[in-house]
Amino acid sequence: MVWKRMSFIAVLLVLFAVCFYWMNQSYDPLARYPYADDADREILLEYLDQEDINYLITQQIKPEEIMPFIAVEGFDIANTRWYSTALQAQEDDVAYIVNFINEYRSRMTYSTLEDILTHYSYSDLIRYFETSDDYDEQSELVTRPDEFTLVLNGHKTVFSYEPSDLTLLEHLPVVSTQSESKGFYLRAEAATALQQLMEDATEINGELGGGLTIERAYTSFESQVALYEQAVSEHGEQASWFEDMPGESEYQLGYTVSFALNDSWEEQVEIAEDGSLDYSACEEKLSNLQRQQISWLRENAYRYGFVIRFEEGKEAQTQKAWQPFTLRYVGVENARTMHEQDSCMEEMNFASS
């Protein structure tokens, strides 16, 4: 009786072992993954281990997200959606994208990845990540540098961003430039508005622009490097009152324009130890025409969507010395509101305006 019972148990164990073997042989690790066809399944099983497959299933990663990258050396399944989003935002070699994300993912957030790669090239981002400490070690990359009400303060940087619709300022009075200069540019909307402003400013003295002469408009990162270093050479620790670090200048956005002023204006600004600024010597140098131009811009620039970017009396907010001939395009409605409220950009909440 005991022998029969033991024989029966042995048979059951053998049957269990055989069944378990055949179940393992027929087990499909991708049984809970409904997205792949036979060809994709074969590749997935070739490159992924069980832990990867579990991640694939729980995160519901689609074949179109993973298949372009799965065979690339260094592929990390946890970065799959980063790779896919990067490729959609800015096409490049998939191996390059995998290496880029693996190396710099910690410097970005997934929620802003698409915006960043819409406005900055991979090479520019690498250069920023590797050299951002050169001027401002606290700099923070702006993810959407194309917003026309963007204020570059608090260590915000657009690094080497270049607007896509820069428009040459033609048929307007400009200062003489070096022969290699390609002229002055603004973004298309701002350029159109400036054209109208200059035409209407003729009423100041009968000349196109009312005697105003464009001296500066869109400025590239490389040009800003030279301008900032020149300001440091001339003003030392006070340089930030007159010029911004490369990447942190609003001229790089393509919405800011300046007209020629007396060469000695900055030198004549007196900065006290308490940070107060005195423009008495500057104003003494102003001609009657310049006084008329300043008055006209204060009274009329908003009608064309421009504001005096660094106005007198707003130094505490802007952290810049008064620059009466520097205009910033913010759109007609915003400019009108700022004019009526006597506000500078730092005092505005553009998101609700």
What do the predicted segments below correspond to?
Residues K4-R216, F221-S353:
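Extracytoplasmic cell-surface/polysaccharide-interacting catalytic and binding patches
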